[in-house]
């Protein structure tokens, strides 16, 4: 068993992080580029980075911010401070909009306060004739 991964899990569980094992696995792979189940352990540099990220996550910084990106529908978005993290319920909203718009010839869609742009981008990818405009005024939301 990978001791570093176990330590990372224990730290996140102790901090009360929801889905601590999932988060630990994501952080481990992000830092090392390897699967914790098949790895003997991180290098000293990787262990140091893992410790820093574990403390940030234990402090409730969103996993998506730590990773810098997050999958949404069938694509990956840049994510960071200044935007809300795309979540599963955002995918449901986007899928519902796609279902409503898919048979329209040239729907016009405005994604206001777009943040990552996940809703507008998801619709644009799935409804080829859609004219989609994403609007975000906050400079903090721009990568």
What is the predicted role of each segment?
Residues 5, 24, 50, 60-63, ...:
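A general structural signal for well-ordered alpha-helical segments in protein cores
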